[in-house]
């Protein structure tokens, strides 16, 4: 049996599944012949086998029970590590000269600014270790690409010069009132999927049609907010590096640096309310990234709330709801037969026991087996049916593009030389999802770690919205509702007992139309969105923009 990625588009689970299961990725997986054209010598097949040998040596020091568990996990591995590398290969790239960019913000310059504090003593204007970071900014001509003409746009890179990491971003100013509208950072998941898929498939100002042309989106989230789309971690989308990020905490440092330098360059946006939104594996990212921002008392980031859509945040609670969602208890017909449903029920106690051990130790030695066992036992039965894991209502129509042909259109568009040139990208090819990164995070134990424990700390300071399209399987609404009710925080009892109420459109010609359900107490809100799959803004664009605008307006907090 081979380890193959059971990818969650914008939230991928690396699960052990039967060898006939198609590797999801298509155009997103190493697009173009130049993807790995420049590979360091130590990234040979022999180089990749070394981690496995070291890994096997470490196993000798474990208890008999732990070794038995790892022997079971090892049966899921390919014989040769060059078939399943634990490190992402560097992308071929060509760095543009400084003269190409309109602005370069040096982290060392920002770090050198001292001010007089309230106690009369000198202190840095902003906190954080920024010396190694630079931000490169290019004002992009909307007319050259036909994407939201008339709307101000910036693209560029955050450079971590110490670790040779370069994160690509694309900023769109609000169509409405940019001097007063909030700013939102959007993050897709994976781990290892580009946020530009969210831009062009979900909530950005344009989608890409079959002719590989941009099409105006009336329901774009920059209708009433300025939005930053960030390709992170490195080696995702247009981002690149010769090093790697393998856990969510490390990625959080980069995001803090990006925002700090961006708002330093553009103080007109820094004064606006700021929010972080994302989906799927962003259920891991966002609690960490928001906590990182809030940990800095001296900051220029006006964080007001976070929004997580169809996220994976608390595996212990959420994995319990794969069987109900697959077996007809989530509001849609059953996908699995009774025998498969029973096998999932039988596997759940062991799965939760393993996750519980992961939560206690937070050790990769415990968390990795939990991820692989639980994904194999509770995700693979659904995958084998050929049904779309992101939408229980239909089959996976395009397995080479994570079930959606539109992802292939996006990849084709972003690989056009004229697009790469217009946005200043420095890689020779764009890939929508990098499954090497997915494995990096998995084998560092990140997948099952208890990042939900950070949410109570967020609730003390800012509002948190958990929303879920109710047709998604992979990060389904049942599990998301359940973990929010199980979360221990001062308002738990009142929140858990709150009833779901109708969510209706209030501000357009469809006023009164029911689009979902909502419950809220204090700073915590959950929404179920009717008819939405894993990507709510793609499936239900009107409903998506409705709740988004109202959330930013403070209706539920």
Curated annotation (Swiss-Prot):
| Catalytic residues identified in the record | 280, 472, 534
Q: What Gene3D superfamilies does this protein's entry cite?
A: 1.10.287.410, alpha/beta hydrolase
Highest taxon of the source?
Answer: Eukaryota
- Positions of the propeptide segment: 18-138
Q: Which GO terms describe its biological process?
A: proteolysis
Disulfide-linked positions: 193-433, 327-341, 351-374, 358-367, 396-403
- UniProt-listed Pfam families: Carbpep_Y_N, Peptidase_S10
Kindly state which keywords UniProt assigns to this record, in alphabetical order: Carboxypeptidase, Disulfide bond, Glycoprotein, Hydrolase, Protease, Signal, Vacuole, Zymogen
Q: Which reaction does it catalyse?
A: Release of a C-terminal amino acid with broad specificity
Please state which protein family the record places this protein in: Belongs to the peptidase S10 family.
Function, in words: Vacuolar carboxypeptidase involved in degradation of small peptides. Digests preferentially peptides containing an aliphatic or hydrophobic residue in P1' position, as well as methionine, leucine or phenylalanine in P1 position of ester substrate.
> What is this protein identified as?
Carboxypeptidase Y homolog A
Q: Which organism is it from?
A: Aspergillus niger (strain ATCC MYA-4892 / CBS 513.88 / FGSC A1513)
Q: Gene encoding this polypeptide?
A: cpyA
